[in-house]
Amino acid sequence: MSDNFLSTYSVETRDFLARFNEKYDFNSIRKNLNDLKDLKVLIVGDGIVDEYHYCEPMGKSAKANIIVNRYLENEVFAGGAFAIANHVSSLCDEVQLVTLLGKENSREDFVSANLNPNVEAKFFFREDGPTIVKKRYVHNYSNQKLFEINFINDRFIDEDLEAKVIDYFESIIPLAPCHHVL
């Protein structure tokens, strides 16, 4: 009897995995991953502080047409470019991250504490906006997102900050050549 009835994967996924298994063996995959170790990678992008606030519904509000929720707990993660830098640093020894933080409530301590030791971060601070924070409110039992609030300024940075960022890139590129920029 086939285990197709018990598989958690779709037919397309099972077919892909079968073809992948025929083409690559474990040792070649391990060698290719180990070959990434000496790459120098520069990551440029938006770091995001991801907050998940778990709650449970209590019922309908008597004063408004909304559902009232009881707060239970929260988790905070380094997301966006912060997460990418951490993932890449698990494969490559040298990773540099360039990103913007907000001047007010920068969350710099949290971000720095949650980057892997081999991630060298260069933060630029924008005066006109916060560090990007995404607060998601999630039903504790079903894990369904109820709503999300984003703290973000998605307008262009001002000319002075742009000049600082460009000057920084012009100063590091010749001195520390990167194999890849993400």
Language-model regions: role of each:
Residues M1-K63, L72-L182:
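Ribokinase/PfkB-type carbohydrate-kinase core domain
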Residues V68-R70:
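Short beta-alpha connecting loops at secondary-structure transitions
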